[in-house]
Structure formats: structure tokens, C-alpha cells
């Protein structure tokens, strides 16, 4: 798998033309609502499903989307489980959208989850009209 998209819950200002094509799309809980608003279809929904709207969940079931329902009490966040799922699939490029605003603990949780990864994947978090590139073990060549 080359390119994966993780769509986090929370506010999301990303528009469709900011996105490339993806081999796999994973929605984290209410992130599924963002996926559908972008006229995309998730391959997997991960979460304890405490924030997803019932109509979105019903649509996902109708679309035969795989749903990985997690326990509410766990040692990792829904996002951490989602990103580890993608990393275990040996994806080269991971793009993350969503989770931009709202509860500050969620924002920092997402940020620290990414920073603490020991990975070889290229990770980009699209935050509004900005792209945050997280370093990995590869070299980044910036042309002049």
C-alpha cells in the first residue's frame, strides 16, 4: 500500500482538491462524516463510535464498510489505533486530516501520537490550508 488517508474526527477544513488519490481510507469515529462530505468512501471505520452520527453509521453499514468497534476504556486513543493499523500495513505515505480544533487535549493527543511514532513512513497532517510534514528516517530534498 502506497498512500493512505486517515480522517480524524473533530473539525475539518480540508477540501477535496487538497487531497491526492489514496489506496486506503480509514475514518476515525466521526471522521467518517468528513469522508462522506468529501464525496469519498472509507475502507475502514475505527473507533468506540461514541461521536459518529447514527445516520453515518447506517450509511457505512449499507455501503458494506468494515467497522472496527473498540471498547470505550482502552490504553490507546481511536486515532492511535488507526495510525498503527496503517503503519502495520506498511504504507509509505500517510495523510491525516481532521482534528484541527475543538478539545485541546484531542489536538495535542493527535500531535503527540504522530511525533512519538518510530516509523519510516512519510506523514503529512493537513491542517486548514497548511501541511505539516513529520520527519522520518528518510531525507527530504527541498529544491531551491
Where is each model-derived feature located?
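Flexible, surface-exposed loop/linker segments and immediately adjacent secondary-structure boundaries
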Residues: 68, 79-82, 101, 107, ...
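Short, well-ordered alpha-helix to beta-strand connector turns
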Residues: 22-23, 42, 64, 91, ...
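N-terminal beta-strand-loop-alpha-helix module at the start
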Residues: 1-60
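A glycine-rich helix N-cap at a beta->alpha junction
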Residues: 63-71, 122-124
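Short phosphate-binding loop-to-helix
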Residues: 67-89
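Long, charged alpha-helical interface segments
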Residues: 126-144
Amino acid at each position: 500500500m502506497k498512500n493512505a488517508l486517515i480522517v480524524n474526527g473533530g473539525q475539518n477544513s480540508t477540501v477535496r482538491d487538497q487531497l491526492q488519490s489514496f489506496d486506503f481510507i480509514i475514518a476515525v469515529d466521526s471522521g467518517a462524516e468528513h469522508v462522506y462530505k468529501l464525496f469519498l468512501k472509507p475502507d475502514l471505520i475505527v473507533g468506540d463510535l461514541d461521536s459518529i452520527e447514527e445516520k453515518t453509521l447506517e450509511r457505512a453499514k449499507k455501503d458494506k464498510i468494515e467497522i472496527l468497534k473498540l471498547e470505550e476504556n482502552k490504553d490507546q486513543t481511536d486515532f492511535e489505533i488507526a495510525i498503527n493499523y496503517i503503519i502495520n500495513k506498511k504504507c509509505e505515505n500517510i495523510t491525516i486530516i481532521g482534528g484541527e480544533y475543538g478539545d485541546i487535549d484531542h489536538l495535542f493527543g493527535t500531535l503527540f501520537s504522530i511525533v512519538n511514532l518510530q516509523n519510516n513512513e512519510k506523514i503529512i497532517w493537513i491542517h486548514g490550508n497548511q501541511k505539516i510534514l513529520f520527519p522520518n528516517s528518510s531525507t527530504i530534498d527541498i529544491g531551491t
